[in-house]
From Swiss-Prot:
Protein's UniProt name: Fibronectin type III domain-containing protein 11
Organism: Mus musculus (Mouse)
Location of the Fibronectin type-III domain: 212-310
InterPro entries membership: DUF5581_C, DUF5581_N, FN3_dom, FN3_sf, FNDC11
Annotated PROSITE patterns: FN3
Amino acid sequence: MNFQVTGLALDKMKLDSPHSFLDAEEVEEAEDQQLLEPEAWRTYMERRNVLREFLTTDLSPQLLKRHHARMQLLKKCSYYIEILPKHLALGDQNPLVLPNTMFQLIDPWKFQRMKKVGTAQTKIQLLLLGDLLEQLDHGRAALDALLEAPDPRPFLAGWGLVEQQLADLSVVMDNFLAMMVPGHLHVKHRLVSDIGATKIPHIRLMLSTKMPVMFDRKESVAHQDWVSLRWFVTIQPAAPEQYELRFKLLEPRTQQECTQCGIVPVAACTFDVHNLLPNRTYKFTIKRAESYTLVYEPWRDSLTLQTTPGPPEGPAPRLGEPPAGL
């Protein structure tokens, strides 16, 4: 009896060991191999490795996750028109006109039309990026399911279609990466008219991107009747920027409390808002100040803070006792 129990325990140990699972996988692979001739089996394994390599390098889950994060960031960015003069012809003695000077020469009405074009182009570009990323997600899911299919025969029979899918997904990825960077704006008409004998160089319009302005949620702190706010931009601009801070009291209880709101222009990344009510909730919103070249700003960061309670009132006098100070 003891020998039989020991033997059963040993058999159980073998079944529970990793080696038994490896044997099971080998058995399953051997069963699949019996479905194909040796040459076909080698072809199947080679093509399966090609597909696995594509899914682990060119279209890995980690890569798609990074692209999703970049896509979410682009949805929070601000988009502007950037005016750049083209190079003058060789030998021209006139200097290049600086962008600030170019604004004085551009027809304002035509420029407003180009801003609308820039807005539409930016919206379309973001929609296309989302669609391309969705194609990459669905394409990877379909190929991953094909890789895990138990029967190798449909895999071999449809390899031509698989190759086409790999090529198509590579093109989609290239288009996605190329579209991540805002490009030229197509100008149908001249924005700068000829003025007398002055030679004005042709200009080109580009869409540029600025990273979103976001509150520093660790450094922004509420006190009893004031708050200290901090915000930042992930990529620091070359020149100082102007910001617009908005605040308002949530759920005002009286008409007077409805005045607890405001818009404050700020030339730094920090600001203290005073004269607030204690133990109340306020909403704060930060964005860049309005710019003549802004074409699209779909998002702005907001933060909700609650001021701390005021000091407790003194105890009420006992019945029959005069108030304090009398």
